[in-house]
Swiss-Prot record:
Subunit structure: Part of the RNA polymerase complex.
Record InterPro entries: RBP11-like, RBP11-like_dimer, RNA_pol_Rpb11_13-16kDa_CS, Rpo11-like
Protein name: DNA-directed RNA polymerase subunit Rpo11
NCBIfam families tied to this protein: PRK01146.1-1
Broad enzyme group: transferase
Keyword Glycosyltransferase: no
Taxonomic source organism: Saccharolobus islandicus (strain L.S.2.15 / Lassen #1)
Location(s) in or outside the cell: Cytoplasm
Keywords: Cytoplasm, DNA-directed RNA polymerase, Nucleotidyltransferase, Transcription, Transferase
Gene Ontology cellular-component annotations: cytoplasm; DNA-directed RNA polymerase complex
GO biological process terms, semicolon-separated: DNA-templated transcription
EC number: 2.7.7.6
MF terms in GO: DNA binding; DNA-directed RNA polymerase activity; protein dimerization activity
Amino acid sequence: MEIKILKSERNYLELEIEGEDHTLGNLIAGTLRKISGVSFASYYQPHPLTDKIIVKILTDGSIAPKDALLKAIETVRVMASHYIDEIKGLSK
């Protein structure tokens, strides 16, 4: 995975993530939309044959786009950890 910043402003961040597809795009964008202060979050895959997504984040100014992204990633990490613990508990 390689991440490039395409555009960075006070309330807007646009990233290109190489080596990822709809799986990560949907997860990140959906989680971002639930964060207070995020006005808009989306992603798209420029071409169906490429392993690359573009993520766009717009905030209302109460949170920086990078901070919102970090919060979303931490939320996903905690959620995944919870699922791992739940699945491990099933085998007991």
